[in-house]
């Protein structure tokens, strides 16, 4: 019998992300090659037909994860003594699939129910630990080192937050940490009106609450944050492996900024 899942709402969406990475691993040329995701899929007792993942969703998830892995790898190559905060980590295997220096302290953070599930699915390892807490609360930062460069990664988190909560979370994290980088995915504000048509959001009851327009607007609302770059999933070189119609649609969307950057990655330093 598999591990029983008791997650609802936004926390249930992590299972769709897991399914997307597992499906990618079965492709002739995987984007991420996350064999752990496929193993976890077999171990979990859950009706995945509720959140059936379409090919386009699989591509978004894996393009996003691959680019975040690349950005994180570049940061850790320069800062092998860093502390990594993976916020709303879900069941992601980033701490295990990346080539992480032994000197890095990696901390996965998510709500207690998710961390309890992770503790049953993932092994213990030196330099790795988990914190069970909502990332929008304050106390969990008390045990995070303040004397090391920090990498903050949030994947599939910010669109589900309220704007005030998301900005305060960033302010709190940056006040606590000395220097480093923040990288996360974000949606444009116009997408919030259409999120209700998402099959995944309808199935789980989750909602979108925060869209970020001009990435530089966060610099004035989160002191110390400095915008570096944005990257659209439509710019992934792996889109070349898509079906002809998907490549044609992608090319058309790339020519319109409001579509190209509707869902993209943002990278900041502080």
Curated annotation (Swiss-Prot):
The keyword Nucleus does not apply. Pathway: Antibiotic biosynthesis; tetracenomycin C biosynthesis. SUPFAM superfamilies: S-adenosyl-L-methionine-dependent methyltransferases. Keywords: Antibiotic biosynthesis, Methyltransferase, Transferase. One of its GO terms (biological process) is antibiotic biosynthetic process. InterPro entries: Ppm1/Ppm2/Tcmp, SAM-dependent_MTases_sf, TcmP-like. Its EC number is 2.1.1.-. Pfam families: LCM. GO terms for molecular function: methyltransferase activity. Catalyzes as well the following side reactions: methylation of 8-O-methyl-TCM D3 to 9-carboxymethyl-8-O-methyl-TCM D3; and of TCM B3 to 9-carboxymethyl-TCM B3. This is Tetracenomycin polyketide synthesis O-methyltransferase TcmP.
